[in-house]
From Swiss-Prot:
SUPFAM superfamilies per UniProt: PLP-dependent transferases (SSF53383)
Keyword presence, Lyase: yes
Binding site for pyridoxal 5'-phosphate: G56, S57, W88, E162, S183, N248
Protein family (similarity comment): Belongs to the DegT/DnrJ/EryC1 family.
GO biological process: polysaccharide biosynthetic process
Species annotation: Escherichia coli O55:H7 (strain CB9615 / EPEC)
E.C. number(s) listed in UniProt: 4.2.1.168
Transmembrane segments: 49-69
Membrane topology category: Single-pass membrane protein
Subcellular localization, as worded in the UniProt entry: Cell membrane
The protein's name in its UniProt record: GDP-4-keto-6-deoxy-D-mannose 3-dehydratase
Pathway(s) where this gene product acts: Nucleotide-sugar metabolism; GDP-L-colitose biosynthesis
């Protein structure tokens, strides 16, 4: 029996040496390594600015929060934001926490991203923002989304936590909107233990992110900035001046040091993931009872999803038991249909556009297995044998 886990370590001696260099420095809190990582991160993905935080979830939190603190607020309580019905929980929680009215839209059962036709119907004069989610490595069709937005004053945001390294028309996923978020949790494309990042080209947004990442103080702002104007030269006072209701979601310095080494390896990681995907797609084309995710642009293939074909008679519970018995780790597709979580949704101000039939079908008939940054041809052959 072959062991086929959901994820595997992306580290070697370079990451352990990076950790040791931080330990030797005795500077454990956010510092120069994090700054270097942010500079390299922005360069890697083609953004002007990058802000590292403690997780992809806190990246989403700061992305939404920042829109309330611009000189002319980009969003206010009660504004409508459109989201797909399938994503991770912390895509949605900041929307509730900042009092936004959330409109859920169905997904495309093939790409697993927001359904373009449903989005087109859902956008109204009340829509102030669209939060797209690039699911399991697959970028959205941003050409179509931008056509829908047209010249309207609608903010485009991206939760790209599962799709680092994906591209659409040679542009990196996570850089199509005003802001995009990334995750570097263990099972993702790179791993910094815990970690996340926000990218933007907007200087005011960037300065707000720097401020609210660490207590809402001015300490991490440049002398001339878009939050306070010009900082005082009195460091004794300025270092403890608080101007925005922020958080403490700073990353550890060792996460920055690890990230520097991981970014160097990212092109190779993505290349191997795509080769695995090519092999996987060939093995599972025309499968008798399973459909696989349809690629949009150039996916970075976080994992390999399956949707049980309608009228196949196959029951997911039995499929999961078979995979687990064979040593193949599998999971639901993200959270499935998030609208099933009625206990938490009672705290939301939300509506549902028409129906979410595809999200409901995925919720009951979808699952995914892992893709890794190492060759998986033997594991994929084994997977195909188990899923005869």
């Amino acid at each position: 029996m072959i062991n086929y886990p959901l994820a595997s370590s992306t580290w070697d001696d370079l990451e352990y040496k990076a950790i040791q260099s931080v330990l030797d420095s005795k500077m454990f809190t956010m510092g120069e390594y994090v700054k270097q990582y942010e500079t390299q991160f922005a360069k890697t993905f083609g953004s002007k600015y990058a802000v590292m935080v403690s997780s992809g979830s806190t990246a989403n939190l700061l992305m939404i929060a920042a829109l309330f603190f611009t000189k002319k607020p980009r969003l206010k309580k009660g504004d409508e934001i459109i989201v797909p019905a399938v994503s991770w929980s912390t895509t949605y929680y900041p929307l509730q926490q900042y009092g936004l009215r959330v409109k859920f839209v169905d997904i495309d059962i093939n790409t697993l991203n927001i359904d373009i036709e449903s989005l087109k119907e859902a956008v109204t004069d009340s829509t102030k923002a669209i939060l797209t989610v690039n699911l399991l490595g697959n970028p959205n069709n941003f050409d179509e989304i931008n056509k829908i937005i047209g010249g309207r004053d609608i903010i485009l945001l991206e939760d790209n936590c599962e799709s680092m390294g994906a591209t659409f028309n040679n542009k990196c996923a996570g850089t199509f909107g005003l802001m995009g978020t990334f995750s570097s949790f263990y099972s993702h494309h790179i791993a910094t233990m815990e970690g996340g990042c926000i990218v933007t080209d907007d200087e005011e947004i960037y300065h707000i992110l720097l401020c609210i990442r660490a207590h809402g103080w001015t300490r991490n702002l440049p002398k001339k900035n878009k939050v306070t104007g010009v900082k005082s030269d009195d460091q004794f006072e300025e270092s403890f001046k608080f101007v925005l209701p922020g958080y403490n979601v700073r990353p550890l310095e060792m996460s920055g040091a690890i990230g520097i080494e991981q970014l160097k390896k990212l092109p190779r990681f993505i290349s191997v993931r795509r080769k695995n995907a090519e092999y996987f797609l060939d093995k599972f084309k025309d499968h008798p009872y399973l459909d696989v995710q349809q690629e949009t642009g150039e996916s970075s293939w976080f994992g390999f999803s399956f949707i049980i074909k309608k009228d196949s008679g196959v029951i997911r519970k039995q499929l999961v038991e078979n995979l687990n018995s064979a040593g193949i780790e599998c999971r639901p597709i993200v959270t499935g249909n998030f609208l099933k979580n009625t206990d938490v949704l009672k705290y939301f101000d939300y509506t549902v556009h028409n129906n979410v039939d595809n999200a409901e079908y995925l919720d009951k008939n979808g699952l995914f297995v892992g893709n890794h940054q190492i060759e998986l041809f033997d594991e994929i052959d084994y997977l195909r044998e188990v899923l005869k």
